[in-house]
Regions:
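Conserved SAM-binding motif I beta-strand of class I
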Residues: 16-21
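Conserved SAM-binding loop
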Residues: 30
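Conserved SAM-binding loop of SAM-dependent methyltransferases across substrates and taxa
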Residues: 1-13
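A conserved structural/catalytic subdomain of Rossmann-like adenosyl-cofactor enzymes
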Residues: 56-335
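Conserved SAM-binding strand-loop segment of SAM-dependent methyltransferases
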Residues: 40-47
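Short alpha-helix immediately C-terminal to the canonical SAM-binding loop
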Residues: 27
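Short loop/turn elements that flank and shape the SAM/SAH-binding pocket of Class I
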Residues: 49-52
């Protein structure tokens, strides 16, 4: 808990961190994590959707004394941030309330507060600020009110990038998620799409992105690179033609065709299996011949079966082999 903020602090120790968390249980782990890593921060126990502040804590780091956590008075004023990093609870139910944070947009549906979190974050950004959200892929293509909100965000040139991540990255959910990057006063008039959904390694029950795979995403984003089957800068007009749907496969074709197997090699393998099968069949036929039947009717039926079975095996052996047929297939195949 708090890993994203810790990573931000590690890259920029001069940053002033304000962390907001609604879960009282998570607050305990968050404060512990900050103290153990020696990271100063303000932590607010807060319901972002209703803007209700419950408690406020400050983690202070001093060279002369241990890290101290002390509760301070709750400030009721608003704030503006240079950077917002958020991994809110996915598709959380909420009670829609129309306030200034959502001006110019429809309200997110009561069954899914994803866009309410997004609009709250954008509202709290400074004029040149950046907000990064980790959310389920549904926010990219769901319709009705969410579709209208997404359309207005695109028209207002606030969406800077859409990054698809592998599934099963987090311990609390196995669904694939995406990163949405928002910027105020953007210069670019397109949206960068990155498809990193296949970039992971298996680690027991989880998927992990290697440092090289993470750096590839970062470099691609920083350079806004177009890479075949991986990333692409898409114009707003093309997105408009797709009815403001941001589903990544609409803009990046990452399909990798499977190699066509060698027909002759497959035929050889099948033919070898057939030979082994016939050899085994003939051995079985020989064993059947050695059986002794005392009942005349049973002996007659047994002898007829052995005869038919042997003739079948012999006739199969003399037929055109699968290997020969495979050669014909390969000869006539058009690639």
């Amino acid at each position: 808990i708090g890993g994203l903020s810790l990573a931000k602090y590690k890259n920029n120790p001069d940053v002033v961190l304000q962390l907001e968390e609604y879960s009282k249980n998570a607050i305990c782990f968050l404060l512990f994590n900050l103290v153990m890593n020696g990271v100063p921060a303000v932590v607010i126990e807060r319901n972002v959707l209703t803007q209700e502040n419950i408690a406020k804590y400050r983690v202070e780091v001093s060279n002369k004394s241990p890290q101290i956590i002390k509760e301070v008075c709750i400030d009721e004023g608003t704030y503006s941030a240079d950077t917002i990093i958020s991994n809110p609870p996915y598709s959380l139910s909420w009670v829609p309330v129309n306030d200034e944070r959502f001006n110019g947009y429809k309200l997110a549906p009561k069954s899914k507060a994803d866009y309410a979190f997004i609009l709250d974050g954008i509202y709290s950004l400074k004029n040149n600020g950046t907000a990064v959200f980790i959310l389920p892929h549904g926010v990219l293509f769901r319709g009705q009110a969410e579709g209208d909100i997404r359309q207005n965000l695109i028209k207002n040139n606030l969406i800077d990038a859409v990054i698809g991540l592998p599934s099963n990255l987090f311990t609390n959910t196995g669904i694939p998620v995406c990163i949405l990057v928002f910027k105020k006063n953007r210069v670019n008039k397109d949206i960068l799409f990155i498809d990193a959904q296949k970039d992971f390694i298996k680690d027991k029950s989880k998927n992990i992105m290697t440092s090289e795979q993470v750096l590839k995403v970062i470099d691609t984003y920083n350079n806004r690179s177009d890479i075949s089957k991986y990333s692409r800068n898409v114009s707003i007009s093309e997105i408009e033609e797709n009815d403001y749907n941001l589903n990544i496969p609409r803009y990046i074709d990452s399909f990798e065709p499977e190699d066509i197997p060698d027909a002759v090699q497959l035929a050889k393998e099948l033919n070898e299996i057939n030979r082994e099968s016939r050899t085994l069949g003939l051995e079985i036929a020989e064993m059947l011949k050695q059986l002794v039947c005392t009942d005349p009717d049973a002996k007659k039926e047994h002898d007829e079966f052995v005869k038919e079975f042997t003739e079948f095996l012999v006739s199969s052996d003399s037929a055109c082999t699968i290997e020969e047929q495979g050669a014909v297939i390969k000869k006539n195949r058009r690639c």
